[in-house]
């Protein structure tokens, strides 16, 4: 969601539909608001189906006190108002009851964002607000106090979560990222001790400013690749393999050039013109490639057979990345044939240590690699091949997590693995 593209009513409806569609709230739960520069607050209504919200349902509360709209505002308007009073820098608030964050809420635990560099950078300070009755002035004071102390994410005891942002896309992306971290941690809890990154590893490294590639008319192949990248990025988002803030996909174009997703742009709203043409050191004017651009460039340079590369942090796969657990592919034939053996690399920065990471993967030898506390790196012959590999990886990880309460894994025997290698030509 890009800020400023829609009227506040439409932006609130689009965001709530997205939250509801991905089961991050219920028909009756959660509320969103936007504050205009003049102090006007737009907020979701009380007692209206979140799954069927329309722009006309959104309530407008003017700074002078007038109310416009056909419904009463959300019963939790008091805490939205209190947050804005405590934090003049905030332009939007998201409140919802997503499953994993509610699990932390009812256990009175904070989701540990130090398991991933990007999540830690996006979510900022996460704190608790003491319980109070929903809709009460006391709850508003409790939440506003937490925001006033500098938090961007406030967990509510036995309730849910409240997230603030400079605008609604910013707040939503922070919310979605925190819920994905919580999902990862819940799944990781079944696998072993969660590994937290030390402070020196949590610094988000920046790429040097890239040079500019000369403008050239796109070829037919480039046009097709841009469209294909967008289709598979949207599909990966729908499959929850990527989220709005995390994950990158690239495809080799020609020579040293490749096309890659942009940095800090909502993955679900990516369109072909937003895809970035890049090399290891340059890109199209006025665009910012993903922070993984240097890594992808190194992989293409090292491996002429690689046609597409994906970095992703899907929840089940990430659970293996943040614990010592081994992601075994000797589960079913599809997993072994598509993924082969999945190695795990000690934590490495995809920006500063791109060359080190790139040396560990190749299409023929090791097309899938886990990077501790970073996620998955997948190489394919083309975009479809890489996407399929990522999808199978997450499905395999999910099956392994789901098997934990049932008993120890019974892997395919060596004879079966040898047969798969012979029949399917697995190196």
Describe the residue ranges of each PLM region.
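Glycine-rich flexible loops
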Residues: 1-427
């Amino acid at each position: 969601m890009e800020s400023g593209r829609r009227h506040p009513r439409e932006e609130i409806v689009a965001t709530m539909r997205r939250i509801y569609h991905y089961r991050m709230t219920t028909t009756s739960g959660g509320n969103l608001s936007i504050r205009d520069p003049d102090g006007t607050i737009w907020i979701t209504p009380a007692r209206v189906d979140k799954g069927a919200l329309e722009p006309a349902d959104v309530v407008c509360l003017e700074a002078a006190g007038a109310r416009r709209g056909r419904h009463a505002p959300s019963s939790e308007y008091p805490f939205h108002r209190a947050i804005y009073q405590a934090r003049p820098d905030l332009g939007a608030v998201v409140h919802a009851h997503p499953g994993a964050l509610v699990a932390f809420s009812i256990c009175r635990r904070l989701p540990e964002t130090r398991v991933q560099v990007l999540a830690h950078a996006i979510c900022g300070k996460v704190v608790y607000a003491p319980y109070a009755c929903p809709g009460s002035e006391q709850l508003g004071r409790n939440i506003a106090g937490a925001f006033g102390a500098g938090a961007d994410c406030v967990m509510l005891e036995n309730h849910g979560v409240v997230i603030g942002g400079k605008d609604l896309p910013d707040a939503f992306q922070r919310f979605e990222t925190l819920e994905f971290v919580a999902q990862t941690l819940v799944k990781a809890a079944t696998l072993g001790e969660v590994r937290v990154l030390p402070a020196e590893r949590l610094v988000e490294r920046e790429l040097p400013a890239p040079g500019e590639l000369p403008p050239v008319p796109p070829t037919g192949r480039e046009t097709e690749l841009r469209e294909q990248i967008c289709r598979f990025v949207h599909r990966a988002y729908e499959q929850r393999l990527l989220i709005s803030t995390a994950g990158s996909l690239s495809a080799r174009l020609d020579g040293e050039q490749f096309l890659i997703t942009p940095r800090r742009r909502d993955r679900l709203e990516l369109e072909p013109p937003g895809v970035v043409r890049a090399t290891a050191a340059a890109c199209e004017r006025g665009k910012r490639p993903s922070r993984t651009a240097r890594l992808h460039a190194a992989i293409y340079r090292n491996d002429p057979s690689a046609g597409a590369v994906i970095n992703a942090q899907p929840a089940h796969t990430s659970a293996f990345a943040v614990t010592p657990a081994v992601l075994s592919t000797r589960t079913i034939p599809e997993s072994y044939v598509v993924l082969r053996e999945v190695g795990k690399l000690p934590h490495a920065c995809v920006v500063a240590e791109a060359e080190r990471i790139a040396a560990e993967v190749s299409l023929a030898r090791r097309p899938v690699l886990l990077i501790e506390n970073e996620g998955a790196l997948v190489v394919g012959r083309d975009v479809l091949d890489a996407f399929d590999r990522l999808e199978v990886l997450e499905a395999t990880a999910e099956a392994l997590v789901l098997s934990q309460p049932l008993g120890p894994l019974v892997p395919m025997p060596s004879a079966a693995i040898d047969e798969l290698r012979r029949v399917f030509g697995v190196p």
